[in-house]
C-alpha cells in the first residue's frame, strides 16, 4: 500500500541467479527475477540487511497526508453536507412565523446594545464592508420606525437584512455573561418546548445565533434579491461569514456566495482603481468597494472545494508572481504598509492559497517557491508587528490578533510542507514551534479577557489542521516533543468555545479516532512485501479518503432519472467501495480488522 523510498538489498546473490549462474544485483527482488516474473521465489531466498523502519515508509505516508488533510479535515469536516431530498418540504408560513418570533423577541433597546458591542469590539470584522459605520445607528432607528409604521420597501428590507447580519455577528461573539445581561432566556422555554429551565450556557447562544442568521436570510428573501440585486446582499453575506454560517450550511453558503459574486460583477464594481477624473464621492466609493472585493475573495477562497466550482479569488494572481520578487528591485520599499487591513489580510491568505493548492496535487512544490513564501512571511511579520495597537481598544487588538494568527497558520503550513517534501533539518522543530505559537495566541486571549477573539472561524479551522496532523504523525513516529504537543493541543481543543457547535464535537471525534488508530498500529504487525508495506491502519486511512470522495460525487443523484439505463451500483455509493474490497488480496484476518474498525469508528460520522 505504501512503497519503500529505498529498495532493500540482500547480503548474497539470490538462489535463482546462483542456480542460473548469472550476475545478481542483490536487490529485493533482484532485477533479473523481476524481468522473469520470479519475484516471490527471489524474495523467499534472500536475507535482509536491515529490518523495516519508519524511514522506509514515512516519506510516502507524509505525502499521503496531504491528500488526507484535503479530503478529511477540509472538505469532509467543513464543506460537505448531505442533501436530504426525502425530508418534508419547507413550510413558508412556518418559516415566517418562526422568524417573526425572533424578530419580536429582540427589543429596541437591546438592538442598540448589540450595535454598541459591534462598534466597540468587532470593527476588525466588518468596518471594511460598510461605507459609513456611523450610519448604522440611523439605520437601526429607521428599522424600528418601519416596523411601527408597517411601511416596507425592497430598499428598507435590504437595510433590515444588513442590520440583522450585524445582530447575528454580535450574538455569535458576545460573551455569555454579557448576553445574559441583555436578554432573558425565559421567553425561549415555551418556544423551544423545553421541560427544564434553560440558561445561556446550555447551547442557547448557538441556537439564538442560528435563528438570527435565519432572520437575516428571511429578509433577503423578501427583497427577492435574485430579481432585484443590490450590493447590500454582498455586505450582509460578508458579515454572516464572520461566524460559522458557511461551515454550518455549506451548500446554502456556496449558493449565496455565487450570487454575491454575480451581483458584484453585475454592477461592474470589480474595477475600483482610482482615476484622476473621479469626484470625491466616487473616490470614497471605490475605497469601500476595494475592501469589499478583497474580503469577498477571502471568503471565496476559504469556501473553495468540489462543491463550489465557480470562483472569484482565482482572478487575483499569486503574490509570488509580482510582489515577492520586488525586493530584488532598487527603490522598492517592501515594508510599505498596505492601503487597508483587508488588503493585508488577503495577501496573507493568498500565501495560504499558494501552499494549500498542493494538498490535492501529485506535483511537488519547488523549493524556491517555499523559500519565496518564507521571505514574504518575514515581511508581513514585520508589518504586523509594526501596526499601531491601542491596548484599550478591542477593535485594534482583534485586528492584530487576526493578522498574527493568519501569519502563524501559514508559517505552520509552510514548515509542514518543508517536512513532507524536503525533510529539512529544522522542519519538524519549526512545525512544533509554530504549533506552540498558535496555542499561545489562543491562550493569551483567555488571559487578556478577550476570549471572544477565539470564536473567529479561522481558529477552529487552524486547530483542526494542526491537531489532526500531529495526531497522524504521532501514530508512526515516537517523539517525546510531539507527544507532549499532542497533549497540549488536546487540552486546548477541549477548551475551545462551545459556539463552534457540532463541528467541535466532530473534531474531538476525529482526534479520538486517530488515537485509536495509534493503538491499532502498535497492536498489529507491519507486513513487508519487500517493495511495499501493508497494515490495517494504511488501509483504513486510504478508505477514509475514498468514502469522503464518494460522498462529494454528485453524479449518482443527477442520473436517477435515467432509470434502467444506469447500473444499480451507480445509485449506491457504498457498493463501489465494496466491489473494490472484493478484489483485494489481503488475508481475511487483515480485512476483518479493517472492517471492524470502520464499523466502530465510521469516518462518515464527521460529516454534517
UniProtKB/Swiss-Prot annotation:
One of its GO terms (cellular component) is CBF3 complex. GO terms for molecular function: centromeric DNA binding; DNA binding, bending; DNA-binding transcription factor activity, RNA polymerase II-specific; identical protein binding; zinc ion binding. The keyword DNA-binding applies. SUPFAM superfamilies: Zn2/Cys6 DNA-binding domain. It is found in: Nucleus; Chromosome, Centromere. Present with 1900 molecules/cell in log phase SD medium. Acts as a component of the centromere DNA-binding protein complex CBF3, which is essential for chromosome segregation and movement of centromeres along microtubules. CBF3 is required for the recruitment of other kinetochore complexes to CEN DNA. It plays a role in the attachment of chromosomes to the spindle and binds selectively to a highly conserved DNA sequence called CDEIII, found in centromers and in several promoters. This is Centromere DNA-binding protein complex CBF3 subunit B. It comes from Saccharomyces cerevisiae (strain ATCC 204508 / S288c) (Baker's yeast).
